[in-house]
């Protein structure tokens, strides 16, 4: 085959295990042979619609087989897949579509109203399943590992979402890392209730499982009771989630009685696993495989395996097998054990750059290393401990919230003179946003009205849960807001 990318995977896997179940969703089950045929029909349909190699094809919808079919079909057609966060508002979706230059948007029925409201002019909007061609012979175009496979949008310190260009090689090497670290098997039954528009659910679970010939069980939304039922009824072997999801499962009334004997692997990312949560699962004979990563690394960077969870609780782990990680000082110099430094990453899983953003790319990719903006220490055994975030990012229930993006919107509200968004502790979500606002002279701002206004402009999880008003914010001599001082005073 001339196609060496992800688009060839369904064809290659169908040759090896055509009758094995690839994907389950609700009452639908697809074998690898069926998945391969469906992917080929969609790839041919995209080509018939005018999609050419390098063109961008977007997808909007919850976890569904159509997501994976569109991803692989883009790979066969040589196109670039653009998964969209269905929790975003219309203005945010418009930005991603315009920035990526997507020519086609495939969507599931529940998002038809949102799709109709989009401003994108020349965009071909197609309900999932309606672009399939009759020909199920897969196109074999020359696609290499260095070609861009997908654009995954991630906000940055500037507050404007950027499309991380992940190549076919980035995603393939990340899968190899996962297979080495977690011992995934061909009889794997992996439950995915976390959204696939995030790099972790896709890169750490779906793709490695499909590469090995296991079964991916998709849930459109997370429900702790449904997860417990699926584990029992489907004999699930692997579950992925963020700490808040695992907390909800452990708090469910059926937690103690549910049969979890089939589970072999619990993958957790997005935030460190609290010690008490790890203990609750250890009491049921279950240990987490924890990870630290980022979209720009497809996403795996550090891994803490089962054998060291109890010994290294709170650690983010050691570098993934084919990934190099070190700590750098302000001038890029190496940092000795025990001292703080910025996490920098190198390896075949690190992105090609940000789509259409050469300056932003140059800021983070320097001398072959990706500069994460996260601060950590390394202990004497080589285990990394993430201690701070240079970018002030808030992690709420596994979702990344960048204050600059929220602050940009706040400044558009009448009467807001200055503002800062910080993260504050929350028993359920780990951390939530709080807006600290300075009203302009003579302005009276109602906090509830301000938050309601934000909900029309941002995804719900990005909207701060509270507002506090103040006469002034602490600043440097040049007028830059001192976020650390804001957190100390108002957090």
UniProtKB/Swiss-Prot annotation:
Q: Name one GO biological process term.
A: vanillin biosynthetic process
Q: What class of enzyme is it?
A: ligase
Q: What is its EC number?
A: 6.2.1.34
What does the record say about activity regulation? Activated by Mg(2+). Retains 73.3%, 61.2%, 36%, 22.6% and 4.1% of the maximal activity with Mn(2+), Co(2+), Ni(2+), Zn(2+) and MoO4(2-), respectively. Nearly loss of activity with Cu(2+), Ca(2+), Fe(2+) and WO4(2-).
Q: Which SUPFAM superfamilies match?
A: Acetyl-CoA synthetase-like
A GO molecular-function descriptor: ATP binding
**Thermal profile of function:** Optimum temperature is 30 degrees Celsius. Denaturates at 45 degrees Celsius. Retains about 60% of the maximal activity at 16 degrees Celsius.
The reactions it catalyses are: (E)-ferulate + ATP + CoA = (E)-feruloyl-CoA + AMP + diphosphate; (E)-caffeate + ATP + CoA = (E)-caffeoyl-CoA + AMP + diphosphate; (E)-4-coumarate + ATP + CoA = (E)-4-coumaroyl-CoA + AMP + diphosphate
Q: Which residues bind ATP per the record?
A: 291, 295, 374, 391
Query: What is the relationship between pH and activity here?
Result: Optimum pH is 7.0. Significant loss of activity at pH 5.0 or under and at pH 11.0 or higher.
**Pfam families the UniProt entry points to:** AMP-binding (PF00501), AMP-binding_C (PF13193)
Q: Which residues form a coiled coil?
A: none
Alphabetically sorted, this entry's keywords are: ATP-binding, Ligase, Nucleotide-binding
InterPro entries named among the record's database cross-references: AMP-bd_C, AMP-bd_C_sf, AMP-binding_CS, AMP-dep_synth/lig_dom, ANL_N_sf, ATP-dep_AMP-bd_enzyme
CDD domains according to UniProt: FACL_FadD13-like
- Family under the similarity heading: Belongs to the ATP-dependent AMP-binding enzyme family.
Task: Describe the task this protein carries out.
Answer: Catalyzes the formation of (E)-feruloyl-CoA, AMP and diphosphate from (E)-ferulate, CoA and ATP. Active also with caffeate and 4-coumarate. Less active with trans-cinnamic acid. Not active with 3-methoxycinnamic acid or 4-methoxycinnamic acid. Involved in the degradation pathway of lignin-derived aromatic compounds of plant cell walls. Catalyzes the first enzymatic step in the conversion of ferulic acid into high value compound vanillin.
The molecule here is called: Feruloyl-CoA synthase
User: What organism does this protein naturally occur in?
Assistant: Streptomyces sp
Higher taxonomy: Bacteria, Bacillati, Actinomycetota, Actinomycetes, Kitasatosporales
